[in-house]
Regions:
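Accessory nucleic acid-recognition modules appended to NTPase machines
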Residues: 1-111
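A short local loop/turn or secondary-structure capping micro-motif enriched for an aromatic residue
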Residues: 33, 115, 127-130
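Short catalytic-loop micro-motif centered on adjacent basic/acidic residues
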Residues: 98, 119-122
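Active-site beta-strand-loop-beta-strand hairpin of nuclease catalytic cores
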Residues: 111-119
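Catalytic cores of nucleic-acid endonucleases
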Residues: 124-164
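C-terminal helix of von Willebrand factor
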Residues: 164-170
Length: 170
C-alpha cells in the first residue's frame, strides 16, 4: 500500500492477519542504512500471503497452469513468485523490506544478513535481466546482491544467482 491508501482504515485487520501468520508485511525503506528497521516507512508496504497454495486457490489457478507454464498466467506469475520467495524468507526468520525509487527502480526484497544489507531481485521468467538491481547496486554499492530466478546458480559482477527451487538455502 502506498501513502494515502486505506492502510489506516485497515490497520487493525492487517495487524491481526500478520499476528496470526496468515500474511507478512514487507515495509518500504526510506533509505538503505543499518539497522533497516529504523528506516522503514510504515505508510508504504506490501502484503504477502503466507501460503502460495492458498493464493493460487483464491485466484482459481490450477496446478496444471503452473506446471505447464500457461501463458495466460504471465501477469500473475511475477506476483506469485515474489509471494513464494517472501514466504521462504519469512520461514528462515528474515525481516524483509522493499526499496523503490520514484519511477526508476524497485527491489523486491532488502534484508540484513550477517551485518550486511542484501538486495534481492525476484524474476519469474528465464529472461531475467535485472535493471532495478543494477540501479540499486550503482547507488548503494552492496558487497553483493542476489537475483532469484529460473536460472541456475551463478555469480557475475557481484550478483549471486539462485534458482527458485533453492531459496530455502539463503
Amino acid at each position: 500500500m502506498k501513502s494515502g491508501g486505506r492502510a489506516a482504515e485497515l490497520e487493525n485487520a492487517i495487524e491481526w492477519l500478520v499476528l496470526a501468520g496468515i500474511v507478512s508485511h514487507v515495509y518500504g525503506l526510506d533509505t538503505v542504512k543499518k539497522p533497516l528497521d529504523n528506516y522503514k516507512n510504515i505508510d508504504s508496504f506490501k502484503i504477502f500471503v503466507s501460503d502460495v497454495g492458498l493464493l493460487c486457490a483464491k485466484n482459481n489457478v490450477l496446478a496444471n497452469d503452473i506446471l505447464y507454464a500457461s501463458s495466460e498466467l504471465n501477469d500473475f506469475k511475477g506476483g506469485m513468485t515474489e509471494n513464494y520467495v517472501c514466504s521462504q524468507l519469512v520461514c528462515r526468520s528474515y525481516e524483509c523490506y522493499t526499496w523503490f525509487s520514484e519511477g526508476e527502480a524497485e527491489i523486491d526484497f532488502v534484508l540484513q544478513r550477517e551485518g550486511k544489507i542484501i538486495p534481492i531481485e525476484v524474476k519469474s521468467a528465464d529472461n531475467s535481466k535485472a535493471k532495478s538491481l543494477s540501479i540499486y547496486t550503482g547507488k548503494f554499492k552492496p558487497e553483493y546482491a542476489i537475483k532469484i530466478s529460473a536460472n541456475n546458480f551463478g555469480f557475475t559482477n557481484g550478483i549471486k544467482t539462485i534458482p527458485l527451487y533453492a531459496v530455502f538455502c539463503l
